[in-house]
Amino acid sequence: MPGDDKGMAGARRAFLAQDYYAPLRRALCELSVSLTGDHPRVLDSGCGEGYYTAGIYHALVNAGKAPQMAGIDISKSILRLAAKRPEPIEYAVASSYHLPVADGSIDLLINCFSPLAREEFQRVLVPGGHFLYVVPSARHLWEMKEVLYDHPYPNEVKETPYEGFRYVTIRHVEAVIHLQTQQDIHALFQMTPYYWKTPKDGAARLSALDTLDTTISFDIHAYERI
């Protein structure tokens, strides 16, 4: 099955429900409100279990807007969790490269840690519409990486132009979180690409920890559809 399996999906939801990533969600909410009109049509591409999707919905409603929102993901397991949320958001199993929406039908597209399908995003966004592209910044999870690897290196940070889009701004989000249990540490580890490529000795060092303070660091790139 593509995407997260049932166990990983549940761990992800339990982790995010504790609001460790609340600073990122708050920044996404603020940008979503500032970049949309009164009746925005919003698509979260790679929405996962809907943590950011639901937060953005409530932010738009609280700002007096009437959003129409949808989310897509390739994982059936994680979308089942998203569909249990109470917000009136439509969810569908789909790829970012084959979005099940009409041409020029979206005002704001959210893309958190998912593949950037430039041509498909350009197709579905209205001219003047925006997409928010979230990527890990240089020191994201630095302290966790120090446990996992002998010689960790920072993530590459760059502002990339894309054909058909105007680069609007970058919003940097950074905080230090305190992971209170080994369960939380492992859940976060599962959410990262490091889970699949870390040597066994590094993973063993991480599994021996009961708590961990680590930096979370993100860049939100905002683009406008030309």
Question: What are these model-derived regions, one by one?
Answer:
Residues H39-G48:
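Conserved class I S-adenosyl-L-methionine
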Residues S75-S77:
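Conserved SAM/SAH-binding beta-strand->alpha-helix loop
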Residues V173-I226:
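Conserved Class I S-adenosyl-L-methionine
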Residues E49-G64:
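Conserved SAM-binding loop of SAM-dependent methyltransferases across substrates and taxa
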Residues G3-A27, L31:
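Class I SAM-dependent methyltransferase Rossmann-like catalytic core
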Residues Y97-L108:
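A short acidic, Gly/Pro-enriched loop at the edge of an enzyme's catalytic core
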Residues E87-L99:
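Conserved SAM-binding strand-loop segment of SAM-dependent methyltransferases
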Residues G128-A138:
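Conserved beta-strand signature within the Rossmann-like core of class I S-adenosyl-L-methionine
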